């Protein structure tokens, strides 16, 4: 599975230098962080609605859109899916309460 994420992350990096007229992702990057975050909000809402409706096919479709745009956000911030996978691995085996207690105090 991470092969797909790795290939997608590589493509998203390449799109940073692409012409915004030639690529949807390049256009998102050109519009800036707020546009990317707005798109994530839209996709999250659509995923929630699909889940509420109980339509498995739409849940998968909308979650794929949400993941995709989250990967765009990560790439825009100089991060990638491996950063998230490392964090998930770090949390593996911890209870939710232990994980929360290990977070830095703000």
UniProtKB/Swiss-Prot annotation:
SUPFAM superfamilies linked: all-alpha NTP pyrophosphatases
Keyword Nucleotide-binding appears in the UniProt entry: yes
A biological-process GO annotation: L-histidine biosynthetic process
Keyword ATP-binding appears in the UniProt entry: yes
Keywords assigned: Amino-acid biosynthesis, ATP-binding, Cytoplasm, Histidine biosynthesis, Hydrolase, Nucleotide-binding
Family annotation (CDD domains): NTP-PPase_HisIE_like
Similarity section: Belongs to the PRA-PH family.
Protein name: Phosphoribosyl-ATP pyrophosphatase
Taxonomic source organism: Methylobacillus flagellatus (strain ATCC 51484 / DSM 6875 / VKM B-1610 / KT)
Encoding gene, per UniProt annotation: hisE
